[in-house]
Amino acid sequence: MSLDDRLAAPRAMAPEMCSLNMGTMNFALYPAAARITEWRHDWEKPFLEGSDDLVFKNTPRDIARILQDLGAERSARFEFECYDIGHLEMLRHFADRGLVAPPFFIQFVFGVLG
């Protein structure tokens, strides 16, 4: 999915607040496939099993564009999702550049392979 595709809904809906992952990462959910015995939908198992090759792209350029497009231009506030220490450093980087200012709403997400 392109960045424009990802931005289409928040551009149309103009939320007051939205989530922003602070970096590119793997969402390696495949270990769950071995633990689940009943599936509700036929896409669930292949999706989980295939997550060992899934990358969620959110580069510094992507993040800067999101901050500009939704934040500066549409006044959205962000809930910054940080999955590791590097994501906190990325947030500091954008604060140092003046693209985002405190107070920060930070969601620490731990326990995801990635």
What would you call each of these model-derived segments?
Residues 17-114:
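Catalytic alpha/beta core domains of metabolic enzymes, predominantly
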